[in-house]
Amino acid sequence: MDIFRVLTRGASVKKESGPKAKAADYSVINGKDENHKEDNNESQIVKELDFFRNKRIISKVEDDREKTTENDSPNKEEKSGNDDGLIKPVITNTVEASALRKSYKGNVSGIDIPLPIGSFEDLISRFSFDRRLLNNLIENGFTEPTPIQCECIPVALNNRDVLACGPTGSGKTLAFLIPLVQQIIDDKQTAGLKGLIISPTKELANQIFIECFKLSHKIFLEKKRPLQVALLSKSLGAKLKNKVVSDKKYDIIISTPLRLIDVVKNEALDLSKVKHLIFDEADKLFDKTFVEQSDDILSACREPSLRKAMFSATIPSNVEEIAQSIMMDPVRVIIGHKEAANTNIEQKLIFCGNEEGKLIAIRQLVQEGEFKPPIIIFLESITRAKALYHELMYDRINVDVIHAERTALQRDRIIERFKTGELWCLICTDVLARGIDFKGVNLVINYDVPGSSQAYVHRIGRTGRGGRSGKAITFYTKQDSVAIKPIINVMKQSGCEVSEWMDKMAKMTRKEKESIKNGKAHKERKQITTVPKMDKAKRRRQQEMIAASKRRKNEELSKKHFSK
């Protein structure tokens, strides 16, 4: 394309007409005008910039945009407006379904399993999918379903219980949000709370709320009543208790277990009419920390037709047993291996000898250029996280630390700084190991070996999300010889290349498995510091001398006082 010709289009240049003028104009070759070519090139470039032009689903939605706008208006009667006669479902029989499942290594079991969807077009023809919800999906860049969405969405829309396990970053949040929003739309005649989502952490609950809010944008259930989604925060809990806000105002509520139980026990929120109960990170919500709280929530949801769903990146056997006991003929969906990590993550083990060697290893990563931001570093305790933060801060690394002792406001600010790129390296405990979706994390470092294979999968799952590649490095020492075995098993199941010594390593004995389960495999670690032992001893002696001097002065003062 001639850029000067484009820039001077507005100029008025008089030219002679006739055959002579055409002969003098070298842009006309073989009877074709170059200006015409330029216009074609321009239109071609515009098409290339329109990333979704080749999607059939986009063009269909654009054709119906005016109809959708009418449906969005709160002053007009809602219409389904789903003219689905021209759209044919991609998956029509069990042969096509098995071929699709084979392509993404999906394992689905249960009674009377619904066919998966091959695209979002399937939802329109099979379930009269709402056009406004489809628009919201497309506007947020979701044009094709992920494997776990292909399986779980039709199961949920058939009102079946589901136990789903998929790799980190595989789209599990939308797998339960899309059918939930659709079911709320279908049940628009009933007012009050119908959908309840439970999450183990505030950060994850907030993230789910944001995604749910995007999906439900501009969706009206009645003439002037929009679909209402709420995050059960401390302030909202107080409003519900004081009857400032009615508990029937919201259609979907997202909460952590303890906060929800507190509101329910104060009779500020009625869960008896809830029809859809979803446990995100189910393995955490049904372990010994949360199991009693989760049981209380289940007891409060007394609707006979209650649909239950459990989602996680790892599903231990005890969670499967609980699922079978509380669910009615559940469909079990496993994408990949239930104990494997995301295949987009390159996993690596580094032997550091001792605790001092870990700091040397991090500094070596910086020197060798492997320390590429954004980076998340996981440690096993708050004390160790603080200590590492001070060490790296003095190395002039753009770093901050997040843990349970920080306030909610501080944690939110740090997460926001990390997401915007203002912060390069984030040190944290397992408080951020689950569910939080950080776009583009290049590297995850396990400074301390995780307590279990499930914790390892969730930690390294902060990278390699949404189809991107990532890297995970785990430091280990001599005392981690038992604790490292589950990590090696995950690496093997994920298809990672492992060293010869890993292949030759003996399988875990029953005693070793019990020690890992009870936390005995992780022995007490030394303090993180680079101060030499002689300097430490010198400081300790100085502190003892100062303390002794103060003690002597106090004794002298007390003697003088009594002598008087």
Curated annotation (Swiss-Prot):
Residue ranges, annotated region (Disordered): 1-25, 62-87, 512-564
EC number per UniProt: 3.6.4.13
Residue ranges of every copy of the Helicase C-terminal domain listed in the record: 344-506
Annotated residues for binding of ATP: 166-173
Stored InterPro entries: DDX52/Rok1_DEADc, DEAD/DEAH_box_helicase_dom, DEAD_box_RNA_helicase, Helicase_ATP-bd, Helicase_C-like, P-loop_NTPase, RNA-helicase_DEAD-box_CS, RNA_helicase_DEAD_Q_motif
Catalysis performed (reactions): ATP + H2O = ADP + phosphate + H(+)
Gene3D superfamilies named among the record's database cross-references: P-loop containing nucleotide triphosphate hydrolases
MF GO annotations: ATP binding; ATP hydrolysis activity; RNA binding; RNA helicase activity
One Pfam short name: Helicase_C
Keyword flag Nucleotide-binding: yes
GO CC, one annotated term: cytosol
Span of the annotated motif DEAD box: 280-283
Residue ranges constituting the Helicase ATP-binding domain according to the UniProt record: 153-333
Subcellular location: Nucleus, Nucleolus
Motif (Q motif): 122-150
Listed GO biological process terms: maturation of SSU-rRNA
Composition bias, Basic and acidic residues: 13-23, 62-86, 553-564
Subunit structure: Interacts with the U3 snoRNA and is associated with the 90S and 40S pre-ribosomes. This association requires the presence of RRP5. Also interacts with OSH3.
Role noted for this protein: ATP-dependent RNA helicase involved in 40S ribosomal subunit biogenesis. Required for the processing and cleavage of 35S pre-rRNA at sites A0, A1, and A2, leading to mature 18S rRNA.
Similarity section: Belongs to the DEAD box helicase family. DDX52/ROK1 subfamily.
Domain notes: The Q motif is unique to and characteristic of the DEAD box family of RNA helicases and controls ATP binding and hydrolysis.
Record-given protein name: ATP-dependent RNA helicase ROK1
Organism: Saccharomyces cerevisiae (strain YJM789)
Gene designation per UniProt: ROK1
